[in-house]
Curated annotation (Swiss-Prot):
Disulfide bonds join 136-141. GO terms for biological process: detoxification of mercury ion. GO terms for molecular function: flavin adenine dinucleotide binding; mercury (II) reductase (NADP+) activity; mercury ion binding; NAD(P)H dehydrogenase (quinone) activity; NADP binding; oxidoreductase activity, acting on a sulfur group of donors, NAD(P) as acceptor. FAD binds at residues 110, 130, 135, 145, 211, 403, 411. Keywords: Disulfide bond, FAD, Flavoprotein, Mercuric resistance, Mercury, Metal-binding, NADP, Oxidoreductase, Plasmid, Redox-active center, Transposable element. Belongs to the class-I pyridine nucleotide-disulfide oxidoreductase family. The gene is merA. It is an enzyme of class 1 (oxidoreductase). Resistance to Hg(2+) in bacteria appears to be governed by a specialized system which includes mercuric reductase. MerA protein is responsible for volatilizing mercury as Hg(0). Plays a pivotal role in mercury resistance under thiol-depleted conditions and cell protection. Protects cells under thiol-depleted conditions. Homodimer. The keyword Cell membrane does not apply. This is Mercuric reductase. Its EC number is 1.16.1.1.
Length: 561
């Protein structure tokens, strides 16, 4: 039995809410909470995270500590927090009041901004209309990668390069159990990394409701519990994220189609799945469902990855088709009908029938309900907030970061933008440089890019040279018996400086950050080739690709330097 001490409860209803929150924590079998005693008794499975327990309570606005936690450890943790708060307060010594920062949203950009603003001495009011944590942890990056990993394991059990010595088998898929495992990890991370952190910081006030601008110095918040509240601010960050876009296809809105949110929450695997779209989300989920047992058809308006180097789309299309995924290029749905539990899609290549329909054609910024015009904030034609490198909007008091802006829609970009916005909102000067921004698509093989493609460089007037190394020249790929894909390096003609890398490989995401650092540090291709790379790693492919500018790597020994 695990015991918690809980402070802040004021009634038996508080205790009931705490009990409900604790019993949602993965690993908690039961909870007995007493308001008069200020305690909770928990039956938990071994390995249950103590941080998740305390975070669940903190998320409700109360404080929880393990009753049997070592006093010294508690003191150290408390002292560390006090030192942090005092250091922030020192930034605003004297009579100068702290900057009042309002943050709309609670995802990656919002959290990063709130925490950095507090470090800078600000008082933060964070406003969230839905579930704390935003898209990434709740319905995006985290659950999708868990599902993709499970699908990868199922695929390897069914088929691998080592089937000659390791007998293949058809796995039994229990989607409901996979979903429970997936959701447990999502809940754990949300408690530990969002709710608990917010609840444990006295400089952050969380308001649950929907915000809209009253003017350029205040917000009106329609509270989830009823009523309204006005929040005044010196600076405001809009970090409201984005939602799945829905194309105007006749009959679509009247049908029970899936977006990525519903697909990730489904406890069944459809026999037939049609996917409209060739976005990152569309392709990642298409392959995951196929590997878990669905017969998948992808409808791509153009080709896969048509904005990238053509070789990328060709490689992924070939990999999908090899797994039995049907890819219909240059195909659009002109009509959607749902009859007798079946979707019927009218397309430019005939009729398509499916049990479920996933629509993943991009994401739309969540800005329409904010009354941005009342604050003089400019948006583009898509509704995205227009910002500069400092995350400043057209209103000097209002900043924006993340998917609600015209920045690339990646959570790590959002978090970096949120941090820099907070610095600028509290009197600093920080800019976000995206010239060496790595991007990864978690298909198999993965797609990873950074910097210029050749076409992009030529568009900007840069003369280039390039080399493409197929993976049958990379020892790690040969040892894996999986040589699908390539690594392409793009250099600036004359200076020979590396300016872009595109990779399609089973672990391309693990090598692209090295390429990003090389570009960021303005390395030449020869300097990259001269570096030491561990033998039999996929990232060694970068060195080999760099060597191809001056020699034939097929004529080198295995680990020639």
């Amino acid at each position: 039995m695990t015991h918690l001490k809980i402070t802040g409860m004021t009634c038996d209803s508080c205790a009931a809410h705490v009990k409900e929150a604790l019993e949602k924590v993965p690993g908690v079998q039961s909870a007995l909470v007493s308001y008069p005693k200020g305690t909770a008794q928990l039956a938990i499975v071994p390995g249950t995270s103590p941080d998740a327990l305390t975070a669940a309570v903190a998320g409700l606005g109360y404080k929880a500590t393990l009753a049997d936690a070592p006093l010294a450890d508690n003191r150290v943790g408390l002292l560390d927090k006090v030192r942090g708060w005092m250091a922030a307060a020192e930034k605003h010594s004297g009579n100068e009041p702290p900057v009042q920062v309002a943050v709309i949203g609670s995802g990656g950009a919002a959290m990063a901004a709130a925490l950095k603003a507090v470090e800078q001495g600000a008082q933060v009011t964070l406003i969230e209309r839905g579930t704390i944590g935003g898209t990434c942890v709740n319905v995006g990056c985290v659950p999708s990668k868990i599902m993709i990993r499970a699908a990868h394991i199922a695929h390897l059990r069914r088929e691998s390069p080592f089937d000659g010595g390791i007998a293949a088998t058809v796995p039994t898929i229990d989607r409901s159990k996979l979903l429970a495992q997936q959701q447990a990890r999502v809940d754990e991370l949300r408690h530990a990394k969002y709710e608990g952190i917010l609840g444990g910081n006295p400089a952050i006030t969380v308001v649950h409701g929907e915000a809209r601008f009253k003017d350029d110095q205040s917000l009106t918040v329609r509270l989830n519990e009823g009523g309204e509240r006005v929040v005044m601010f010196d600076r405001c960050l809009v970090a409201t994220g984005a939602s799945p876009a829905v194309p105007p296809i006749p009959g679509l809105k009247e049908s029970p189609y899936w977006t990525s949110t519903e697909a990730l929450a489904s406890d069944t695997i459809p026999e037939r799945l049609a996917v409209i779209g060739s976005s990152v989300v569309a392709l990642e989920l298409a392959q995951a469902f196929a590997r878990l047992g669905s017969k998948v058809t992808v409808l791509a308006r153009n080709t896969l990855f048509f904005r990238e180097d053509p070789a990328i789309g060709e490689a992924v299309t070939a990999a999908f088709r090899a797994e039995g995924i049907e890819v219909l290029e240059h195909t659009q749905a002109s009509q959607v009908a749902h009859m007798d539990g079946e979707f019927v899609l009218t397309t430019t290549h005939g009729e398509l029938r499916a049990d479920k329909l996933l629509v993943a054609t991009g994401r739309t910024p969540n800005t329409r309900s904010l009354a941005l015009d009342a604050a003089g904030v400019t948006v583009n034609a898509q509704g995205a907030i227009v910002i500069d490198q400092g995350m400043r909007t057209s209103n000097p008091n209002i900043y924006a970061a993340g998917d609600c802006t015209d920045q690339p829609q990646f959570v790590y970009v959002a978090a970096a933008a949120g941090t820099r916005a907070a610095i600028n909102m509290t009197g600093g000067d920080a800019a976000l440089d995206l010239t060496a921004m790595p991007a990864v698509v978690f298909t198999d093989p993965q797609v990873a890019t950074v910097g210029y493609s050749e076409a992009e460089a030529h568009h900007d007037g840069i003369e280039t040279d390039s080399r493409t190394l197929t993976l049958d020249n990379v020892p790690r790929a040969l040892a894996n018996f999986d040589t699908r894909g390539f690594i392409k390096l793009v250099i600036e003609e004359g200076s020979h400086r590396l300016i872009g890398v595109q990779a399609v490989a089973p672990e391309a995401g693990e090598l692209i950050q090295t390429a990003a650092l090389a570009i960021r540090n303005r390395m030449t291709v020869q300097e990259l080739a001269d570096q030491l790379f561990p033998y039999l790693t996929m990232v060694e492919g970068l060195k080999l690709a760099a060597q191809t500018f001056n020699k034939d790597v097929k004529q080198l020994s295995c680990c020639a330097g």
